[in-house]
Amino acid sequence: MNDAVTKPKTRTKTKVERPKLHKVILINDDYTPREFVTMILKAEFRMTEDQAYKVMITAHKLGACVVAVFTRDVAETKATRATDAGRAKGYPLLFTTEPEE
C-alpha cells in the first residue's frame, strides 16, 4: 500500500502595484513676483521659460494650477523645496500636493 499524501502545488502570484501618483499644485498669491515664480518652476521642475510662464499665468488666473505629477515622495520633496525657496526670499510662495485620482 501506498500511504503517501499528495498535496496540490499552489502558486502565489505577487501582485506589484504601481505607486500612487500625486499632483504638485502651485497656489497663487498676490505678493510673490511673477519672475520669481517662473524662476522656481524652471529650477525645481525643469520647465522651459514658456512652460513655466504658462503654469504661473494659469495659477494667477485660476488661483491654482497643477505643476506636475510624481510619486508621493518626489512630489512632496519638490513642493517643499519650491515653497522653502520662496520663504527664504521672504515670499509666501506655496506649493502643495494631493493624490491624483
From Swiss-Prot:
Name of the protein this chain belongs to: ATP-dependent Clp protease adapter protein ClpS 1
Membership in a protein family: Belongs to the ClpS family.
A single BP term in Gene Ontology: protein catabolic process
InterPro entries: ClpS, ClpS_core, Ribosomal_bL12_C/ClpS-like
Function: Involved in the modulation of the specificity of the ClpAP-mediated ATP-dependent protein degradation.
Organism: Bradyrhizobium diazoefficiens (strain JCM 10833 / BCRC 13528 / IAM 13628 / NBRC 14792 / USDA 110)
Subunit structure: Binds to the N-terminal domain of the chaperone ClpA.
Upper classification of the organism: Bacteria, Pseudomonadati, Pseudomonadota, Alphaproteobacteria, Hyphomicrobiales
